[in-house]
Swiss-Prot record:
Belongs to the chorismate synthase family. Keywords: Amino-acid biosynthesis, Aromatic amino acid biosynthesis, FAD, Flavoprotein, FMN, Lyase, NADP. This is Chorismate synthase. NCBIfam families: aroC (TIGR00033), PRK05382.1 (NF003793). HAMAP family: Chorismate_synth (MF_00300). PANTHER family: CHORISMATE SYNTHASE. Gene3D superfamilies: Chorismate synthase AroC. One of its GO terms (biological process) is aromatic amino acid family biosynthetic process.
Length: 365
């Protein structure tokens, strides 16, 4: 299996399966002398880990990350950083009934066709369990970007099923299990999820992610446009079916006079572009939104086939999230951080001595 690495100068490689012994992460390209301990990475892992509320999977993983290499005396050395997270709460017996069957909406059929062999326990490599290591690796990028460039990456749940956040307060995001910025919607979300869980069904969600205090100049103008690499990273997250940058699909109904962002010496007057112009960061906030599909693992029956092509009815057992979007915020933050970090390293390597005479325009007024 290829395709387990992302990035060019700042790269992360992950390994491990849902019910394997552990998850492994390899980070290459982190500059030296960055103060780094496990505590710097654990906070986001704790936000993502399962079993923290009745609205998520009841699999109980501590998700404790350990740094195996790449640091000395609490600082990065500039060499490869290796990370490990042990899996401790596997219940593989829950998946014995799908060993020779295909769950609709999952990667069972495609993995079987591509490799001729698959780890059916919890979805194996295709499980979102893999994203725990992305969050750990992304924590390194987040710390470097914040410490060296002042870039801060934050996300929140803007919609769960039919329920949209209408008010916004960053303080509320980490004050409820949904990462919802609207305190007035929390009770509604709880009631909706309680009813959904009892029905045995699932639902999708929308997550918004921003990167503040961005420098100008990150990204390449053609195939490695900043927004293209952001979309690549976001679409690599399990269950993500759509990505928007800035105005996104709203641009379809906007007139050009509305969509273009006026520029003054005092700042951009709007940010419909989402912080990227011509594939290169403008210095405005990066604005990203992702859509996540409903979980396919349901206790409600559905038609499928077995490995012999015989028709069957599938009912999925195990512990699953009725809405994967609830735990997706730290994952999306990590992928945005990893992408921006890679472009920071690339810009530093190629353009560190460039000095434009044009004044730097502040972000939106």
């Amino acid at each position: 299996m290829s395709g387990n690495t992302i990035g060019k100068l700042f790269t992360i490689t992950t390994a491990g399966e849902s019910h394997g012994e552990a998850l492994i992460g390899i980070v290459d390209g982190c500059p030296p002398r960055l103060a780094l301990t496990e505590a710097d990475l654990q906070g986001d892992l704790d936000l993502r880990k399962p079993g923290t509320s009745c609205h998520t999977s009841q699999r109980h993983e501590e998700d404790l990350v350990k740094i195996l290499s790449g640091t000395f005396e609490g600082k990065t050395t500039g060499t490869t950083i290796a990370l490990i997270i042990q899996n401790t709460d596997q219940r593989s017996k829950d998946y014995g009934n799908i060993k020779d069957t295909f769950r609709p909406g999952h990667a069972d059929y495609t993995y079987d066709q591509k490799y001729g062999f698959r780890d059916y326990r919890g979805g194996g490599r295709s499980s979102a369990r893999e994203t725990a290591m992305r969050v750990a690796c992304g924590g390194i990028a987040k710390k470097y970007l914040k410490q060296v460039y002042g870039i801060e990456i934050k996300g929140y749940l803007s919609q769960l099923g039919p329920i949209k956040a209408e008010n916004f307060d960053w303080f509320e995001v980490h004050n409820n299990p949904f990462f919802c910025p609207d305190a007035s919607k929390v009770r509604t979300l709880e009631e909706y999820m309680d009813a959904l869980r009892k029905s045995g069904d699932s639902v999708g969600a929308r997550i918004n992610i921003t990167a503040n205090n961005m420098p100008v100049g990150l990204g390449e103008p053609i195939f490695d446009r900043l927004e293209a690499d952001i979309a690549h990273g976001m679409m690599s997250i399990n269950a993500v079916k759509g990505v928007e940058i800035g105005a996104g699909f709203k641009a379809i109904t906007q007139k050009g006079t509305e969509h273009r962002d006026a520029i003054t010496l005092s700042g951009f007057k709007s940010n419909h572009a989402g912080g990227v112009l011509g594939g290169i960061s403008s210095g405005q906030d990066i604005l990203v939104s992702i859509a996540l599909k409903p979980t396919s693992s349901l206790r409600l029956p559905i038609e499928s086939i077995d490995k012999n092509g015989e028709p069957i009815e599938v009912v999925t057992k195990g512990r699953h999230d009725p809405c994967v979007g609830i735990r997706a915020t730290p994952i999306a933050e990590a992928m945005l951080a990893i992408t921006i970090m890679d472009h920071v390293m690339r810009h530093r390597a190629q353009n560190s001595n460039v000095a434009s005479i044009t004044p730097i325009i502040p972000a939106s007024i």
